[in-house]
Amino acid sequence: MVKINVICIGKIKDKYIRDGISEFSKRLSRYANLNIIELPEEDDNKGIRTAITKETERIIDALNKRNRSYSILLDLKGKLKSSEEMAEEIENISLQHSEINFIIGGSNGVDDELRKLVDFRLAFSSFTFPHQLMRLILMEQIYRWISITKNIKYHK
């Protein structure tokens, strides 16, 4: 069973998003060992650049504790893939790595240092989504990818 870490900045504030994440976490528990790692959000009153730097450092520290894992950054500048393509990608990654990290930066983004460090940068769309909502969208897609590879009747 593959271990999936969702490394993200901040806590979920809206109940409907928490409920959706909880539902997909429950569904995923049959197929993956899911771990959501919430890192503190930096107050940007000292400047956005400072906030981005500190949040990026926290993400890198979390990644450094997970050696031999494969890291995917959700990034507007990343590569677009279909659900089917990503399902195949995740299947291939899980054959070589027992642990996969999905990273969602804070509302101000991440440093280029992190972009260089990760194994893959994935764009979901050219649209901008709130980072908390993106966590729910990611959870749904992880479940969709697994449902595709396991032939679960979910993806149409």
Task: Give residue ranges: language-model regions.
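N-terminal beta1-alpha1 ligand-phosphate binding loop
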Residues: 1-28
